[in-house]
Amino acid sequence: MGVKGQLLQDPFLNILRKERIPVSIYLVNGIKLQGQIDSFDQYVVLLKNSVTQMVYKHAISTIVPAKAISIPIPADTQTEQDEP
């Protein structure tokens, strides 16, 4: 994943982790996992519920927060939507 992916992914996961927002994580095989983001790196997300699960990012389809969040994006940064 390039730099652009990290401009959205890291702040999104960081807000979920810091604010301990419950999430539903849907895997590419359709399985739904629920819990709170405990930690993450370039390849995995640690999801904490009654136990902590290591979920590989390549297996994740969608992450749905339990409440709406706002991601601060620097004004001088273009997103893929801004490009022609």
Curated annotation (Swiss-Prot):
The keyword RNA-binding applies. Belongs to the Hfq family. It comes from the Bacteria. GO terms for cellular component: cytosol. This is RNA-binding protein Hfq. Homohexamer. It comes from Nitrosomonas europaea (strain ATCC 19718 / CIP 103999 / KCTC 2705 / NBRC 14298). Residues 10-69 form the Sm domain.
